[in-house]
Swiss-Prot record:
It is a lipid-anchor. It comes from the Bacteria. GO terms for cellular component: plasma membrane. InterPro entries: Uncharacterised_YajG. A lipid is attached at C25 (N-palmitoyl cysteine). The keyword Lipoprotein applies. PROSITE patterns: PROKAR_LIPOPROTEIN. The keyword Glycoprotein does not apply. Residues 1-24 form the signal peptide. To E.coli YajG. A lipid is attached at C25 (S-diacylglycerol cysteine). It comes from Haemophilus influenzae (strain ATCC 51907 / DSM 11121 / KW20 / Rd). This is Uncharacterized lipoprotein HI_0162.
Length: 199
């Protein structure tokens, strides 16, 4: 009887140890989640333009970062996608400034957000790492009376000891993303161009 109890105990301990080992070996997610901050602008009710917003992703590289860990190349992607993030940002921006966002056919002004860069370059040595992030987007306004464009750019760098991973990359890229979003929210030139060039 004592032998049976010892076998049961050892089996339970073995299963627990194997479970913990396998849990520790699970692959880290290659998705980094982003949430745009909310705009703080007060609504201007005198806006008459109905604006159609589209976003396109012109980045040369689709992942937002890549690095090597234990000899394996890790490629990171954004969730929501970069296109969805900037679509949400621009729609929130225009609504907060009093514009109505409409469909392509029912609008008298068209805004296109062209995302040119959104990513982190990872440099890793034996004892230090360096992260360089850059986000660049150009906003195009088209109306019956003319067109306008403006570029938004934000860069950040971070250095640290040993190797960078998802958490470090996410932290510096989130800071860069929040900064460019706030720059878009604080900008008044795009709203002025919509008013000027819409019919």
């Amino acid at each position: 009887m004592a032998l049976v109890n010892k076998i049961k105990t050892l089996s339970s301990v073995g299963i627990l140890a194997a479970t913990l080992f396998l849990a520790g070996c699970q692959a880290q997610s290659n998705i980094l989640a982003f949430t745009p901050p909310a705009p703080s602008a007060s609504m201007n009710v005198n806006r008459t333009a109905v604006v159609s917003v589209t976003t396109k992703d012109s980045r040369a590289i689709q992942e937002i970062a890549s690095y090597t860990k234990h000899g394996e190349l890790i490629k990171l992607n954004a969730s929501p996608s970069v296109t969805q993030l900037f679509q949400q940002v621009m729609q929130q921006n225009l609504i907060s400034k009093g514009f109505r966002v409409g469909q392509l056919n029912g609008s008298n002004a068209w805004v296109t957000v062209d995302v040119r860069e959104f990513g982190t370059q990872v440099e890793q040595g034996n004892l230090r790492y360096k992260l360089n992030t850059k986000i660049q987007a150009t906003v195009y306004v088209q109306g019956a009376k003319g067109s306008y464009n403006k570029s938004f750019n934000v860069t950040h760098s971070q250095e640290g000891v040993f190797n960078a991973g998802n958490d470090e990359i996410h932290k510096v890229l989130s800071q860069t993303f929040n900064d460019i979003v706030n720059n878009i929210y604080q900008d008044q030139e795009v709203a002025a161009a919509i008013n000027q060039y819409s019919n």
